[in-house]
């Protein structure tokens, strides 16, 4: 019983989390995140303008 509930929770997170995250990406990323992602890139301005957040699964 417990394992099926656990699997259901994991599945719902895997399905709902990306949808929720896409909505947050539309609103824009944290500047610190984009600065970290674009550091050392040749086209830093382009990178910052087109920066997208990538969800990290813990």
Swiss-Prot record:
Q: Main role?
A: Blocks potassium channels.
- One of the record's GO molecular function terms: toxin activity
Keywords from UniProt, A to Z, are: Disulfide bond, Ion channel impairing toxin, Neurotoxin, Potassium channel impairing toxin, Secreted, Signal, Toxin
Protein name, entry field: Potassium channel toxin Ts16
User: Where does the record place it?
Assistant: Secreted
Instruction: Supply the domain comment.
Output: Has the structural arrangement of two alpha-helices stabilized by disulfide bonds (CSalpha/alpha 3(S-S)).
Q: Which protein family is named in the record?
A: Belongs to the short scorpion toxin superfamily. Potassium channel inhibitor family. Alpha-KTx 20 subfamily.
Lineage: superkingdom: Eukaryota
Q: GO cellular component terms?
A: extracellular region
Q: Which tissues is this chain's protein expressed in?
A: Expressed by the venom gland.
Q: List the disulfide bonds.
A: 29-51, 34-47, 38-53
- Where does the signal peptide begin and end? 1-16
